[in-house]
Amino acid sequence: MAAELARGDLMATIERQRFDLIVIGAGINGAGIARDGAMRGLRVLLLDKDDIAAGTTAFSTRLIHGGLRYLEYAEFGLVRESLRERERLLRIAPHLVSPHRFLIPIYAGARRSPALIRLGMVAYDLLSFDKSLPWHQMLSPEETHALEPGLDDGGLCGAAAYTDGQVTFPERLTVENA
């Protein structure tokens, strides 16, 4: 009963105010949009049917990535924007977002050839020219196996190693943005 009264009081307060921006959904994206609007001087209302970061954000991969897979579809603008946002999060939330190294094994006869993987890695590095993270590395089969001894050696040509970001607690990052 008390919660219903509090909700009623809250709704009455909201109805008496004017907002420049109403964001529906208090996950990581909604909170980020609300933060951006508030930083631009807008009067922002952030709404959600549940708790902050209780939906998709809570069950995400926790990756703060630049969209490497979008290079395959020539979405260069999207990749560049994602890389800028990754860099921004690494800078403003180092207590929550940290570098994470990835390895892409390359096998003979795979859909993506070693040359295509290398081209993608170079493009990813060039689109993130202002990054604080290390550039990619192309590894030999021996170097790859030393890093990941569990990989199948059959047809292993090597690997591409690159760094993206990972958020430890996406819910906390969301709350800090809200």
Predicted regions mapped to residue ranges:
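Extreme N-terminal leader/targeting segments of oxidoreductases
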Residues: 1-21, 36-40
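Conserved hydrophobic packing residues within short motifs/helices of P-loop NTPase cores
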Residues: 22-24, 45
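Glycine-rich Rossmann-fold phosphate-binding loop(s) that bind the pyrophosphate
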Residues: 26-27, 49
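N-terminal Rossmann-fold NAD(P) dinucleotide-binding loop
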Residues: 30
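Glycine-rich FAD pyrophosphate-binding loop
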Residues: 38-59
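Dinucleotide-binding Rossmann-like beta1-alpha1 core, especially the glycine-rich loop
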Residues: 62-147
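Helix-loop-beta segment of a Rossmann-like dinucleotide-binding subdomain
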Residues: 125-135, 145-178
